[in-house]
């Protein structure tokens, strides 16, 4: 059951850890694939899989704590196999590796991720219960909607 206390997240908190994971709030909310500056910088194999490296930079008027993001895109399945997020000095701040890809209805989906964050933190994310075609209403993402959430069966959370 979700907690009864709610906290707004401001710009200053966007770099903070999301629920103690190696991801930040910004990693969940902002997609570098939507940034205006996109450049293919070359090919590289990832574990024997041919990839194209896409470099993304936030355009004018877009605020991000990352100066650039590089994504290794599987050329055949069009799935990011690695994402590296860089600070303004060019240092990798966060690396996300796709460890399992699922073929679902003709689409390839990254379902298991390993996230390497600041300070050596590592988080494994599994999409073993991933469902497609699920619809959500805007009200599901309100404070009232979050109070109605139930933990998935078998998640270990009390219901």
Predicted regions, residues:
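Mature-chain termini and adjacent capping regions
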Residues: 1-2, 27-34, 57-59, 146, ...
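Gram-negative outer-membrane assembly/targeting C-terminal domains
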Residues: 137-159
